[in-house]
């Protein structure tokens, strides 16, 4: 059929880096980093290795290093909300205005509440930090409303944001 499939070694590197990126153990994150570098050199077209390296560097607090990989991923997956969310996460510590823009772009890329709850809450957090409480409340309410309608648990971040004094005082904007 003419398709190329990744080698077993490439799949192993990809899965190991994905699992490591979920860890909060700095020793494990630092341990796998040279292996990911080797894998990226060996398989430069594998965007998932670049994604996992960006996540690893972000978990290690190396946001400036993560940015280059995050940009590569976002350029490759420009229409995927999660790529913009990753870029927002990378930018959040040093450039919160850019993070806000990335989260907005993520929601423009996908309006499906099934997938966008986390990014909506991150956007609400940034909006609240800027004093845009009505918009922040609107985002939190949308997440809560969707979760309740689906019979799902309300995320801790939504509960935390909804318990803030600004939330009680704000009137939700109908659209952001």
Question: Each predicted region: which residue ranges?
Answer:
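Charged, low-complexity interaction regions that mediate assembly/partner binding
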Residues: 146-176
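Extended, charge- and Ser/Thr-rich helical segments
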Residues: 2-12, 33, 39-41, 55-72
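Amphipathic alpha-helical repeat scaffolds of TPR domains
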Residues: 1-23, 42-55, 79-89, 117-125, ...
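Short coil turns that delineate tetratricopeptide repeat
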Residues: 44, 77-78, 111-114, 148
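Extended, charged alpha-helical interaction scaffolds
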Residues: 67, 77-86, 100-103
């Amino acid at each position: 059929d003419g398709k190329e499939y990744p080698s077993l070694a490439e799949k192993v590197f990809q899965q190991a880096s994905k699992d490591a990126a979920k860890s909060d153990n700095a020793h494990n994150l630092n341990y796998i980093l040279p292996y990911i570098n080797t894998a990226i050199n060996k398989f430069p077209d594998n965007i998932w290795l670049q994604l996992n390296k960006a996540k690893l560097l972000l978990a290690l607090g190396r946001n400036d290093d993560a940015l280059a990989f995050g940009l590569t991923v976002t350029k490759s997956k420009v229409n995927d909300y999660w790529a913009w969310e990753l870029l927002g996460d990378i930018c959040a510590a040093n450039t919160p205005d850019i993070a806000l823009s990335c989260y907005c772009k993520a929601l423009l890329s996908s309006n499906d509440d099934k997938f966008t709850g986390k990014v909506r809450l991150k956007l609400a957090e940034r909006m609240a930090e800027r004093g845009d409480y009505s918009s922040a409340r609107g985002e939190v309410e949308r997440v809560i409303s969707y979760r309740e309608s689906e019979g799902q648990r309300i995320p801790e971040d939504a509960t935390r944001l909804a318990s803030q004094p600004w939330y009680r005082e704000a009137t939700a904007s109908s659209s952001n």
